[in-house]
């Protein structure tokens, strides 16, 4: 399939459409594991959460714990219950499961005045935080691109940011959001924004 782009090309990433909710947000220094099949999504979510004061446990520690327990977490055939169990073993309270669905096409870009072929993408990023002890989903967010884009790393990062911002209540669900939430060109949340007040939670929830 060959698509065509007008004057603006595919470089600019439009504000994605989002949905999300939270029942409670993590207290500062909550330990979490970000788990998913795409390293770029995991990295973007980890960076965003670190900026919000969440302590992110590296996936390699979970994989090591799984190897010690002779549990397979590689590929796409793993059980989420095993991930939760291994995350608990390494001291995490939350597992943030990330999922990205990416489609790609060859497109003709006329933005320079001359047609040239390039690969463009559309994507949906979904994340949800699960308590390792109770299995409760504490928050969940999803962001879907509204236009095709050419920079897959920037696109996935921006979608991850908007999905998380919606889950945490920093932007409303839908297709409209302040530019300061996830500034274009950065793909990461603005550091100028003050974090929301975390919901009151039992003292034990931060462990």
Predicted feature residues:
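C-terminal/domain-edge helix-coil "capping" segments
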Residues: 1-30, 40-41, 86-90, 102-105, ...
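N-terminal segment of the mature soluble domain
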Residues: 28-99, 132, 136-140
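Surface-exposed beta-strand edges and their flanking turn/coil or helix-capping segments
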Residues: 47, 69-72, 110-111, 142, ...
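Charged, amphipathic alpha-helical segments
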Residues: 92-113
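N-terminal post-signal-peptidase region of extra-cytosolic proteins
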Residues: 76-84, 107-116
